Amino acid sequence: MKGKVVALLHKESTIGILLIIATLLALFLENSPLSSFYDSFLHTPVEIRFGALHIAKPLLLWVNDGLMAVFFFYVGLEIKREIVDGHLSQISQMTFPAIAALGGMVVPALLFASLNFHDEKALNGWAIPTATDIAFALGVLSLLGNRIPFSLKVFLMTLAIVDDLGAIIVIALFYTTKLSLTSLVVASIALTILFIMNRMCVISKGAYILVGVALWVSVLKSGVHATLAGVALALLIPYRINKNGKIYELTKQMEHGLHLWVNFFILPLFAFANAGVNLQNISMSELFGSVPMGIMLGLFIGKQLGVFGFGYLAVKLKIAKLPKESTLIQFYGVAVLAGIGFTMSLFIDSLAYEDAQIYQYADKLAVLIGSLLSGIWGYIVLSKSSAP
């Protein structure tokens, strides 16, 4: 019985279903007489005081700035593992998904920009349709079971990891606010300490987490988005240490320890906190405005065109090969699934339009619609192309 529960918790489809439940619950609460309770819950003030340190934020921002930093720490651990010991460890393995991921970022961004070039504030959301929600996309793919070659699952995972790496770079370069020099100096000191600990082969996970918290606080205060602290911490934790004849794999241990927390608490809570859209506040003209249309078309059309188009071109030019035992139509189906932006797109949306409340409902609904269309069409294509 215990084994079955553990297996269920590690199934991608279980994670996807939980995210759907969290989203539907948020939509129900926001559009019911309980909407005031939902809104007040998200805006509950939470303060932390420790000596001179004082951080006060509503619960929603603790989720977006705090818990999502833990999520990006987990993503950073995944990226490091794949680079050192996995699907990104060899150029030949990462060429095809990297090219496809590049297309999956460039084409949706250009499509969004083409619809919003006239409005500088609206144009700030160009990165929203470039994201892929790996948990949700793999969840849809897992519904097809063994009918899909394992190589396609590996491709989608690798593409999403490269996509996440791109999202991290985008956040660092384009969604950084006014900088605080003092906080950046403190963050630099924390990074230096982590680097020294790495070189000295420190094996205490608690020590890394303690310095990591200091790094997160300083980055939070610096104007750089706090989630980047999670990535930096992950990359500075030693992958494998051989000490006194004993092997310590800190990265794998931490990644394994965070798996359930990230997928069954952090991501569902993020979806619950950010997917609540008041449908009564959205008119059809607003839904078909340039920003929502840029997001919907970017996710559903731009993403599949970019991933499939760049991938197909790479195959035709003999730069890369299709995943083993997969067909071109199956690759197209997976390219469509890459348009499930969901939590990652909602997160970038919260950064792009945090001061522009005019978009805050229609753009979120656009993320949900674009992701839903990508999930449904991707599933149909793959089920038809992989009929038993």
UniProtKB/Swiss-Prot annotation:
<feature type="transmembrane region" description="Helical">
    <location>
        <begin position="14"/>
        <end position="34"/>
    </location>
</feature>
<keyword id="KW-0472">Membrane</keyword>
<feature type="transmembrane region" description="Helical">
    <location>
        <begin position="328"/>
        <end position="348"/>
    </location>
</feature>
<comment type="function">
    <text>Na(+)/H(+) antiporter that extrudes sodium in exchange for external protons.</text>
</comment>
<feature type="transmembrane region" description="Helical">
    <location>
        <begin position="125"/>
        <end position="145"/>
    </location>
</feature>
<keyword id="KW-0812">Transmembrane</keyword>
<keyword id="KW-0813">Transport</keyword>
<keyword id="KW-0997">Cell inner membrane</keyword>
<dbReference type="Pfam" id="PF06965">
    <property type="entry name" value="Na_H_antiport_1"/>
</dbReference>
<feature type="transmembrane region" description="Helical">
    <location>
        <begin position="95"/>
        <end position="115"/>
    </location>
</feature>
<dbReference type="InterPro" id="IPR023171">
    <property type="entry name" value="Na/H_antiporter_dom_sf"/>
</dbReference>
<comment type="similarity">
    <text>Belongs to the NhaA Na(+)/H(+) (TC 2.A.33) antiporter family.</text>
</comment>
<keyword id="KW-0915">Sodium</keyword>
<keyword id="KW-1133">Transmembrane helix</keyword>
<dbReference type="InterPro" id="IPR004670">
    <property type="entry name" value="NhaA"/>
</dbReference>
<keyword id="KW-1003">Cell membrane</keyword>
<feature type="transmembrane region" description="Helical">
    <location>
        <begin position="362"/>
        <end position="382"/>
    </location>
</feature>
<keyword id="KW-0739">Sodium transport</keyword>
<feature type="transmembrane region" description="Helical">
    <location>
        <begin position="295"/>
        <end position="315"/>
    </location>
</feature>
<dbReference type="GO" id="GO:0015385">
    <property type="term" value="F:sodium:proton antiporter activity"/>
</dbReference>
<protein>
    <recommendedName>
        <fullName>Na(+)/H(+) antiporter NhaA</fullName>
    </recommendedName>
</protein>
<dbReference type="GO" id="GO:0005886">
    <property type="term" value="C:plasma membrane"/>
</dbReference>
<feature type="transmembrane region" description="Helical">
    <location>
        <begin position="154"/>
        <end position="174"/>
    </location>
</feature>
<feature type="transmembrane region" description="Helical">
    <location>
        <begin position="59"/>
        <end position="79"/>
    </location>
</feature>
<feature type="transmembrane region" description="Helical">
    <location>
        <begin position="257"/>
        <end position="277"/>
    </location>
</feature>
<keyword id="KW-0406">Ion transport</keyword>
<feature type="transmembrane region" description="Helical">
    <location>
        <begin position="222"/>
        <end position="242"/>
    </location>
</feature>
<feature type="transmembrane region" description="Helical">
    <location>
        <begin position="200"/>
        <end position="220"/>
    </location>
</feature>
<dbReference type="GO" id="GO:0006885">
    <property type="term" value="P:regulation of pH"/>
</dbReference>
<feature type="transmembrane region" description="Helical">
    <location>
        <begin position="177"/>
        <end position="197"/>
    </location>
</feature>
<keyword id="KW-0050">Antiport</keyword>
